[in-house]
């Protein structure tokens, strides 16, 4: 950045001056007599003057079509009526902004604790606060875009990449530090609460549903609070999906597994808190099957009794009655009386029952859920959700893990951040 913004030694300035000189080859300015004759012809001819006179482009040259965007940036193509994307874009303004960034980074480097000051600088961007570096990045991207598609590669190399490289120098250690903070404050507690518990694992131990809500609830959940507090500047929501900010996240490499995980939990939150309170509403319809004369399904105190009558929808809510948690299914065949298919105790009993069946999607909101009884009879229900996959979304948590890295960073940056965090912890202990 020092070399690029040096008015005497800058290779960028030298290159742009050369391009401007070459681009103006063969240009001819319109003389005073030509201008008077043209105005007279317009008056005599009575032609309406266009809103944008495409012929009034200042000096004309054979290379204008190719070098026009660069000449406009350098102020070498300034006809009075020429159409310009933005008169405020100029190479001099860009270099002034680069100098401001360089001075800011030099200030960080000469601080008593450069690592801490650099993390503070990066954190302002993570939290959505504007700084000189990101403003200049955006200005460079705007200049690159204003040059047009033919010059896009040149514009990116000259005006975007130098600042991106400088930004990466700031971001890498800070991203590693944020990874460590995410791992300690969120992931560690998540694993303590849910590892080895149903529905995350095939286990007899149940995960706490209120604790799951504590993590995934929209806006007030632990995950949303962390993301909106620490990453508001580089990550935002579009609908229910978390999406990286295309401008401020330049130089950052988000861990794809992290984005998939938080978006899966965000969708689950929408399903689990559709009406604001914790719970999932859905409908069930029993289906007639051969050799079965009656089924009785109980879900948290809510009963669906079917004895081969005309099938009808019945509404359910899970969790239902908290004093009667669990699911129980009995069936009666033509050859025997009522028998117990399964009794699933606890809050997650209904989800455990669903986990035992086979699921076939019929359309966007309906699934056929089938169970094979010990006598090889098939017991079937159609499940209709109100949003997304309904209660079946909870089965997708099997094998789910919350990644401990938000960003993909190199090992050196990770080691540097961990060492800095260790020093901070040691100082806190001394105090």
Task: Label each region the model flagged.
Residues 1-431:
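Extended alpha-helical interaction scaffolds
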């Amino acid at each position: 950045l020092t070399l690029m913004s040096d008015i005497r030694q800058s290779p960028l300035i030298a290159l742009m001056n050369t391009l401007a000189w070459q681009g103006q080859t063969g240009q001819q300015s319109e003389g005073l007599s030509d201008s008077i004759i043209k105005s007279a012809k317009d008056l005599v001819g009575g032609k309406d003057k266009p809103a944008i006179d495409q012929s009034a482009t200042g000096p004309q040259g054979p290379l204008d079509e190719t070098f026009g965007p660069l000449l406009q940036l350098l102020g070498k193509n300034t006809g009075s009526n020429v159409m310009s994307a933005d008169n405020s874009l100029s190479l001099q303004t860009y270099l002034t902004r680069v100098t401001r960034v360089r001075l800011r980074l030099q200030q960080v480097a000469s601080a008593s604790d450069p690592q801490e000051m650099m993390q503070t600088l990066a954190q302002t961007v993570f939290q959505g606060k504007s700084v000189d570096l990101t403003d200049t990045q955006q200005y460079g991207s705007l200049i690159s875009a204003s040059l047009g598609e033919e010059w896009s590669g040149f514009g990116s190399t000259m005006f975007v990449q130098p600042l991106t490289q400088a930004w990466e120098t700031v971001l890498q250690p800070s991203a590693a530090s944020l990874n460590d903070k995410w791992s300690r404050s969120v992931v560690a507690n998540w694993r303590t609460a849910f590892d080895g518990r149903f529905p995350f694992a095939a286990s007899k131990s149940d995960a706490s549903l209120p604790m799951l809500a504590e993590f995934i609830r929209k806006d007030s959940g632990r995950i949303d609070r962390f993301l909106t507090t620490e990453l508001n500047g580089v990550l935002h929501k579009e609908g229910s999906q978390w999406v990286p900010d295309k401008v401020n996240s330049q130089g950052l490499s988000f861990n794809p597994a992290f984005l998939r995980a938080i978006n899966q939990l965000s969708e689950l939150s929408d399903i689990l808190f559709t009406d604001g309170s914790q719970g999932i509403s859905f409908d069930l319809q029993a289906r007639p099957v051969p050799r079965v004369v009656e089924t009785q399904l109980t879900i948290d105190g809510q009963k669906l009794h079917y004895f081969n009558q005309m099938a009808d929808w019945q509404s359910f809510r899970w969790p239902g009655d908290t004093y009667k948690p669990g699911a129980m299914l009995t069936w009666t065949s033509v050859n025997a009386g009522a028998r117990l298919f399964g009794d699933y105790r606890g809050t997650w009993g209904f989800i455990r029952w669903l986990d035992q069946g086979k699921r076939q999607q019929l359309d966007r909101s309906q699934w056929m859920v089938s169970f094979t009884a010990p006598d090889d009879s098939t017991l079937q229900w159609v499940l209709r959700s109100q949003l997304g996959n309904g209660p079946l979304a909870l089965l997708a948590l099997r094998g789910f893990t919350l990644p401990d890295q938000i960003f993909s960073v190199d090992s050196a940056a990770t080691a540097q951040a961990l060492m800095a965090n260790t020093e901070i912890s040691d100082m806190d202990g001394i105090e």
